[in-house]
Each structure stands twice: as C-alpha cells, then as structure tokens.
Design a protein with these regions (language model features):
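Conserved Helicase C-terminal RecA-like lobe
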Residues: 2-19, 29-33, 48-53, 57-63, ...
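Pre-Walker A adenine-sensing motif
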Residues: 22-28, 244-247
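Conserved SF1/SF2 helicase motif Ia
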Residues: 36, 40-43, 48-79, 251-255
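Conserved Walker A/P-loop ATP-binding site and its immediately adjacent core
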Residues: 48, 61-90, 97, 123-128, ...
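Conserved nucleotide-binding/hydrolysis micro-motifs of P-loop NTPases
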Residues: 72-75, 97-99, 124-127, 214-215, ...
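Inter-lobe coupling linker of SF2 helicases/translocases
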Residues: 105-150, 164-167, 171-174, 178-207, ...
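SF2 helicase motor core recognition
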Residues: 126-133, 202, 216-217, 267-269, ...
Length: 537
C-alpha cells in the first residue's frame, strides 16, 4: 500500500510531495515499530520528515513530534518546515534559545507546556537531556552485565583470562561500570546538573524523527570475539537515544520512531544490527536474534581480510566480520522496518561523475617519516608504549598528515613546506579548472583538514599557491570563516552559488550535509582520504 491516499491538508499552495515521499510518510504512519527511511541523497528526506510529523499530528498518531537534526541544519530545517506548512505551530531551539543554561531550561519548559505541531532541536542539545536517572541506571546495569557475560565467554573460549581480547572486553566492562557508578553516586556531568529536574519523559514528546541517523550508529556490541574490528563501547549520545526509543516503546509509541539517512550502513556491518536495535527490537527478539552473537551467527561470516597496516608500509591479514550470509532472510527482516529508495528508483538528474586519481610522488622526507611510523607501530604492538602516549589511531592520523605535508606533524612546525606535494598538485589542478570554467563561473570545493589559527596551515598555503597561479584572493574562501552561524554560512553559500566565490575550502564535516552549492560546481578535490566510506557519498 503506497501513500497516494494522503491528502496532506495544510501544505503550502503550489507544493506537492512526490510519490516516493508520500509512500515513505504512509509507511511510517502505518508502522507498529520504528521506520528507517533510507533514501538516497537528494530524494527529499527533509520534506518527508516534516510531512510525517504534521500528518502524525493531524491523524492522531502523535500529539507532539520532535525532529532531531544536525546542529548546523537547525535553521535550514525550520525554514523548510515553514515553507511546507506556513501555518504550523513550530518550536525551534535556535541560537537564542541556547544562549545560556537558563534559556535552555526555559526552552524545555516551553516544549512541555505547549501544543506544537513540531519541535526542532539540534543533536547536541537533544543528547544532553536524558530519561530519568532510574531508567538510565537500569539500562546501564544491563549493559554492564552484557559485558560481564562477554568477558566470561571470551575467557572460556580462549582458555586464558590474560588474552588481549579478554582484556579489551574487561576494560570496556570497567568503563561502563565506572560511568554507572558515577551517575548512581550523584557525580553527574555539568550538563546533567544544568538540566536537573527536567526529564525527557516529562516533555510530552511522543514521536521522534531523527535526521542523519547514521550519526547515532556507534552503539557498542559486547561480543566475545572482540578482535574482529567491532566497536565494543557505545558513544554516550547513542546510549541516550536508545534509552529514549525504549521509553517510547514502553509508553505505547513504538511506531512513532523514524530514522532518516542516505547511508544506513557507513562503516561496519554491525550498524545494520544497531538500526534494528533502535527501530525493531521486537522483531529481533521474536526471531531469537536480540544479541549480536545470535544475529551475527545468522547473517554474518568472519573472513580473513587483507588490510593496509595503520603505519602504511605494508599489509596484514585480519579476521573481520565482513561478509553477509542468508541474504534473502536478512533482506526480508530489513524490509520489515525500512523504506529504501536509491537513485535507480527515482532517477535524479545527476551529472555524470568522473573520478580522477592524482598520483603525487613521495619525497625522501616523507619516506623517512613513514619509516618512523613503522617503528612506532612495532613498539605499540609489542606493548612497549602506554596507549595514552601512542597508539595505532595516532599513527594513522600522523600518516595522513605526512601524506599532506610533514610540516603538520608536532615538532616540525619550523620545517619548510613541501614544494611539490599534494598541496601544489591540488593548486595546479584548481588553477587550471578555474581558468577553463571562467566563462560560466564554475566553482570548486577543496576537502582537507581544518585551518589552524596562527602559524602555518595547509589551507592558507593552498590559498597562497592559488593566488600565485593567478586565482584572485577574493574568489577564494574558507567555510570555517562562517563558523557555526547559519546566517553567515548561507551568505557564503549564496556567493558560491552566484559564482562570486569560485573556490571554497573546508573539511568533510563542514562541506558535507547541508552544503547546497552545486549549481555551478565543476570539481571537488579531496586531499585527504576520508575515514569512512559514507564520506564519499
């Protein structure tokens, strides 16, 4: 059953939802459990979320829907809500409502006492307001017990309680127990104390619509095989969202949870299991798959994979949970709570993409630094250095810096920048395309690390090289100059759309979601390999 029957009264004159948007709204309205709206970028998920909140309110499925959106998109969402439903009663947690702790408390009070068609809140503020302390402690105790069982199972399977896997699990268990004890003993965070006496359950919110839901993918999975590359511990905001979803289900509103994302699985197969934990735990339990070990046994395979070493000087074989099995059964389970749309389904008018790798020869200086990374990695693996002093994640990060320019490394601030490295290669490509695209003011994006204040940084170096190659300085901008100010960001993006700014530099995070500057876009230059596959979407 599609959504063609929806009349959507109240929508602005001249605005029409596309068929797939109505179908998604209708699917979520009919659902008894949560709904994952996994629609490709550009399919119109914002309007889907807005229409879902208003239709749920109109039809009596919800009385106070809350939309949780990335911080920098709050104003954009508010504008889209009013564009779609000009007469809607909307409450938005904008910058003014976050001015100080007292203004935040006042905002939550308005949520609780008002009759709203939609409440729009930024991710960060949403995650600071928790369910009741009693509920949190109960859920934290359950997670500690899960780790304890995983430790016991791992020690039994390995026959050695000193095994590295057992140690990792035990460390995760202790961390979870410490967090639980701090909360029990009244050692709350500053944010918790600022919101003392306000609980999520007291707001009257009976529907959650979460935009860019993959931001909440980091739910830990306590498993005895902790050496498979799975994340053990959860991010605090993910545990918080899980608590709220569980409360909504207990209150009889389990069908009023909708997640929206274009990348439901961005980095690990366990993310699909976590989506089911959020949205369809009842189905998991009915199938006997409510533990990750059971789910992985049914749908996954552990296979040897060849991976590049973190230090970048060779390859290693690792056992990873990296292949699905029983795919028909898995897809059937996923379809029960997922509305999926790909570009093949709706044929968005996208330009043909040409991906061009730009090889840059390694310098002797970079080779020396890479050899040092190899030595550091050996010391880390041998346990010869405390994790807080050095670890494989730090080594990988330093490798990225070396590839861009060794001058970014700590202690190398006084080195000369590379003359013919990635930055110079990028500058030459940007300048060439700038010249070719001048007749129609074609624009370009440069994705790299964050510009530092004071001293040398890669952004300013790239800009200086572009100016030296003939690109006017006034046509080059850093997205970070606009900060988190939505008005300044929109002013900057308007200049890019008009062609006044021809080169915009920024990080994946800053130039990703919500950056609508594609009208004149001729090229994107990625100087850093992104951490996650989803960052290439």
């Amino acid at each position: 059953v599609g959504g063609s029957y929806l009349t959507t009264p109240g929508i602005a004159h001249g605005v029409r939802l596309r068929p797939h948007q109505k179908d998604a709204v209708a699917r979520a309205l009919r659902s008894d459990e949560g709904t994952l709206i996994a629609h490709v970028v550009g399919a119109g998920k914002t309007f889907e979320g807005v229409a879902l909140s208003h239709e749920a309110k109109r039809l009596g499925k919800a009385s106070k829907p809350m939309l949780v959106v990335p911080n920098h998109l709050v104003d954009q969402w508010a504008g889209d809500v009013l564009r779609l439903y000009p007469a809607g009663r909307i409450l938005v947690m904008d910058k003014d409502a976050q001015r100080n702790p007292e203004s935040v408390r006042r905002f939550w009070g308005r949520v609780a006492t008002g009759d709203w068609d939609a409440v729009i809140v930024p991710e960060s503020r949403f995650s600071q307001l928790h369910v009741s302390k009693e509920r949190r402690l109960r859920n934290m105790r359950a997670r500690v017990d899960e780790f304890a069982h995983a430790v016991e199972a791992a020690a039994k399977a390995r026959g050695d309680d000193k095994d590295p896997t057992v140690k990792r699990l035990e460390a995760a268990r202790k961390s979870a127990e410490t967090a639980m004890n701090r909360l029990r003993d009244g050692k709350e965070s500053r944010d918790d104390k600022a919101l003392a006496g306000i609980e999520f359950e007291s707001l009257g919110v009976d529907m959650l619509i979460v935009d860019e839901a993959h931001h909440f993918k980091n739910l830990g999975v306590p498993v005895a095989s902790a050496d498979l590359g799975m994340q053990l511990s959860s991010a605090a905001k993910c545990e918080d969202l899980l608590d709220k979803c569980e409360w909504l289900r207990e209150a009889g509103h389990g069908g009023n949870i909708a997640f929206m994302t274009g990348t439901p699985v961005s980095n690990s197969m366990s993310e699909l299991y976590n989506m089911q934990r959020y949205l369809a735990p009842g189905t998991l339990k009915a199938q006997g798959l409510d533990t990750f070990a059971a789910w992985a046994g049914a749908y996954g395979q552990v296979v040897p994979t060849v991976e590049l070493k973190p230090e970048g000087n060779g390859f290693q074989v690792k056992q990873r949970f990296a292949r699905f099995q029983n795919l028909p059964e898995l897809m059937n389970a996923v379809k029960q709570f997922t509305d999926m749309i790909t570009n093949d389904d709706i044929q968005l008018p996208l330009p043909e993409l040409e991906q061009v790798p730009v090889p840059v020869p390694i310098t002797d200086r970079q080779k020396e630094e890479m050899e040092e990374l190899s030595d550091r990695a050996d010391r880390v693996r041998d346990g010869g250095v405390p994790p807080e002093d050095d670890n494989l994640l730090k080594i990988t990060g330093d490798g990225r810096k070396i590839a861009l320019d060794p001058k970014l490394l700590k202690g190398h601030e006084n080195d000369r920048p590379l003359e013919n490295g990635k930055i110079q290669a990028c500058a030459e490509n940007v300048a060439r395309i700038w010249q070719e695209e001048t007749p129609h003011l074609g624009t370009q994006l440069c994705d790299s690390s964050t510009p530092a204040s004071g001293g040398w940084n890669a952004y300013q170096d790239l800009k200086d090289r572009l100016v030296a190659l003939g690109v006017p300085a006034e046509q080059i901008a850093f997205v970070h100059d606009a900060g988190d100010n939505p008005a300044k960001r929109e002013q900057l993006f308007a200049k890019v759309r008009s062609g006044e700014i021809r080169v915009l530099m920024g990080s994946t995070q800053k130039l990703g979601t919500g950056t609508n500057v594609q009208e004149r876009l001729a090229a994107i230059h990625d100087l850093d390999c992104p951490w996650r596959p989803a960052d290439l979407e």
